[in-house]
Amino acid sequence: MELTITGSGKGISVSDAAFAKDFNEALVHQVVTAYMAAGRQGTKAQKTRSEVSGGGKKPWRQKGTGRARAGTIRSPIWRSGGVTFAAKPRDFEQKVNRKMYRAAMRSIFSELVRQERLVVVDDMNVDTPKTKAFTAKLSDLGVSNALILSENVEQNLHLASRNVPHVDVRDVAGLDPVSLVAFEKVVVTVPALKKIEEMLG
């Protein structure tokens, strides 16, 4: 298939295997969910009654006081007691094999093309590390909420873009499925597009 390069009017030929697949919503959902789950910290920890400090001595005798029987001051029903079903650190990672991940990425890119959310440009580099220069370039493309994909993120582009809201600049190595679906547009340079095609085609 052929994609139009915005600004030049030329076309670029890309593989149907990478950019013209059917949208597999279930697979994309699974991969996106797994990616987000893997990013969870998972360090929450609480103490059970056996882990809370103290409580070794019986607070009062079993019978004769008129009070409810108690064996430890660290019972879950007591203030400062342990937690009944205490949360423990856990790993939320879900297994997604390489074949599934690539298929999901092909599916996402194909859907971006169908929805006309993939914008191909010759390059996104700016001459100076000024936000004004970068926003002018975005304005020319008619985008305000976008993921910018470049083969290599140059220093000027990185500095000029980092203070712009709703815009993220990545190189191809930093590409992930969540970012692709999170932004309204995905602006990709021709060298980056070729690299993505090589990865997915």
UniProtKB/Swiss-Prot annotation:
What keywords would UniProt list here? Ribonucleoprotein, Ribosomal protein, RNA-binding, rRNA-binding
- Asked if the keyword Ribonucleoprotein belongs to this entry, the reply reads yes
Q: What does this protein do?
A: One of the primary rRNA binding proteins, this protein initially binds near the 5'-end of the 23S rRNA. It is important during the early stages of 50S assembly. It makes multiple contacts with different domains of the 23S rRNA in the assembled 50S subunit and ribosome.
HAMAP family listed in its UniProt record: Ribosomal_uL4_B (MF_01328_B)
One Gene Ontology cellular component annotation held by this UniProt entry: ribosome
Query: Secretion signal: which residues?
Result: none
Self-association and partners:
Part of the 50S ribosomal subunit.
Q: Which GO terms describe its biological process?
A: translation
Disulfide connectivity for this sequence is none
Q: Which family does it belong to?
A: Belongs to the universal ribosomal protein uL4 family.
**Disulfide bond found in the keyword field:** no
Q: What is this protein called?
A: Large ribosomal subunit protein uL4
Domain of life according to the entry: Bacteria
Q: Name one GO molecular function term.
A: rRNA binding
Classification via InterPro entries: Ribosomal_uL4 (IPR002136), Ribosomal_uL4-like (IPR013005), Ribosomal_uL4_dom_sf (IPR023574)
Stretch list, region Disordered: 39-70
**The organism's lineage?**
Bacteria, Pseudomonadati, Pseudomonadota, Gammaproteobacteria, Pseudomonadales
Q: Which Pfam families does the entry mention?
A: Ribosomal_L4
